[in-house]
Design a protein with these regions (language model features):
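Enzymes acting in ubiquitin/UBL processing and closely related pathways
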Residues: 1-294
Length: 294
């Protein structure tokens, strides 16, 4: 019997809320030391190798990136990332919310540069399982909805129960589409649906939108998406991929609607790593660059 099967027996219906049983990482994190085993460094793609070289010259425990109001619709600010979370990114294991926030800011930046004006983004560091019950979260969502009222899709990378999912929020259609690489029950994300439904009527009232029988958001599962197989913790990378399906080229099961499966290939996963690493090198860690705090 596998560890996953034992987990399902022990926790029954609540097994979805538990971290996945995974093999231990052989190369452990130590601040200031390599993020991957030394023999793997020459095999890293160019941009990941450049970012790794920059990391080795740093003395602190974390690094920061700035963001603009038009990125996350919460004013200008900064996101801070522990180097241990950068290590997890290099090791292709569970990604911290701070890494997902960097990816979100990168996607927002790309949309502005490429003239993609119908997609907006919410802040994963503001809306997650530990904040959904805060009045400040409702206020943030309400103001963000007003700021993005003309967007076709508002994307949120949401983290709960050790897992990331992507929410595509449509204000005009009163609809939320959920892309979950593990196809978990929608009830697990009900808290974030509830807080979105609290902000939605405030937005409609402010906009003076009156439509008969228009109540809460309708929530649907995305049908034809790549799925995460057992044995890895790549859910964050799947959310990165799903965002790419909105903002750029990607391989999706939607290309063949007869498919309801297919997983993220290792080459595609490395390409996601390389893209974020390249953006960090060009726009964050370089002094004086657009998202640098130096």
């Amino acid at each position: 019997m596998t560890e996953l099967e034992l987990l399902q027996i022990e926790y029954e219906e609540d097994w979805w809320k538990q971290p996945l049983p995974l093999p231990p990482i052989t190369w452990q994190f130590e601040l200031g030391k390599d993020l991957v085993a030394p023999e793997q460094i020459p095999k890293l793609p160019t941009r990941m190798r450049q970012l790794h070289s920059w990391y080795k010259m740093q003395k602190g425990k974390l690094f920061g990136a700035s963001y603009l109001d038009e990125d996350l619709h919460k004013g200008e600010g900064r996101v801070w990332v522990d180097f241990e979370h950068l290590y997890h990114f290099y090791q292709q294991v569970a990604l911290d919310v701070s890494i997902m926030t960097l990816w979100t800011v990168m996607e927002s930046h790309k949309c502005r540069r490429c003239g993609i004006n119908n997609i907006g983004f919410l802040d994963p560091s503001t809306v997650h399982e530990n904040t959904v019950n805060l009045p400040s979260t409702v206020d943030y969502l309400y103001k963000a909805f007003l700021s993005m009222q003309d967007k076709r899709s508002i994307l949120l990378s949401y983290n709960c129960f050790y897992h990331h999912v992507l929410l595509d929020i449509s204000l005009s259609d009163s609809r939320i589409e959920v892309s979950d690489s593990r196809k978990r029950p929608l009830s697990l994300i009900q808290p974030v649906i509830d807080v979105l439904n609290k902000a939605f009527p405030k937005y409609r009232k402010k906009r003076k939108i009156h439509r008969p029988f228009w109540g809460d958001f309708t929530v649907e599962e995305a049908k034809y998406i790549l799925k995460q197989p057992p044995g890895n913790d790549h859910c964050g990378f799947y959310v990165m991929h799903y965002m790419h399906c909105y903002t750029g080229d990607c391989r999706s099961a939607e290309m063949n609607t007869e498919l309801d499966s297919g997983e993220l290939l290792i080459g595609e996963l490395v390409a996601l790593q390389e893209e974020l690493a390249g953006w960090l090198v060009d726009y964050v860690v370089k002094p004086g660059s657009e998202y640098s705090i130096i």
